[in-house]
Amino acid sequence: MDFGPLKEFLEEDNITDISYSNGGQVWLKTLDKGIYQVHRPDINNAFMEKLAFQCSNVMGKTFNMAHPFLDAESAELRMNFVHDSIATNGIACLIRKTPAKIRLNKDKLLNEQYITEQLHDFLVKCVEGHANIMVAGETGSGKTELVKYLASKTKEDEKIITIEDTLELHLDKIFPQRDIVAMKTNNIASYTESLVACMRQNPIWILLSEVRSAEAVLAVRNSISSGHHILSTIHADKASSIPMRMYSLLETGQDIEQFLGSIHRYIQIGIY
């Protein structure tokens, strides 16, 4: 694919997200400066529409007034487009980079006051002790990056299986020498079916990239109740809200006390 003037931003490791909106505004999200706007007249509606149609062709999808939303992905990119029939001030796009690398390390976490040393060392011990951990936060807050970092603290001989609907963790590429199976759910292989297959692979750790559906919630609960250990993420406004947030995603009339009791019993650590 031809990313044209966006290529320089995609090649810059410090940039995590590229947002286009409002007929020509380009916003970058970086690891050190946060979010800021750049002036780039060559990145305009015409260019973004061309890029969207390239993506739709590659993905075998349609992008037009009848199908105004497009999700696309490559090995290390996630892209979302909104057609100008819906985004009335011009086509909108968000590109998120999902590189096969661990961006976090202890020095970075401490220097940027992301975490205290005492808490950092405690979390590492929790991983070493096989605690089940859920990481909560807003979109783009770094949940997946923290999960990748914590996963790097698992033991070398412990088998990991990742189950994702969009590939973001890339642990099989980051640790090519380890016993890691990367599963991607789709219309044919659901979370439930992938989890059943996963259990037969005898993993020590099961990593779900994000819990955002009833099926994913049940996958987490079934994983932890069967004795496996999990690292996963969820959208929640604080750590103590994680159990209720998981319950709110369920579509069936699950008994709330029984469900929350199982979550409190089996998930030892919530991080926000």
What are these model-predicted stretches?
Residues Q25-G129, I174:
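P-loop NTP-binding catalytic core
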Residues V135-G137:
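Hydrophobic anchor at the beta1->P-loop junction of P-loop NTPases
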Residues H264, Q268-Y272:
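Conserved NTP phosphate-binding and transfer environment spanning the P-loop NTPase/kinase superfamily
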Residues I15-I18, I267:
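Short acidic amphipathic segments
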Residues M1-I15, M59-H67:
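Phosphate-interacting basic helix/loop segments used at nucleotide- and nucleic-acid interfaces
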Residues K143:
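Conserved lysine of the Walker
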Residues G140:
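Walker A (P-loop) phosphate-binding loop of P-loop NTPases
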Residues I133, Y149-I263:
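Switch/coupling sub-region of P-loop NTPases
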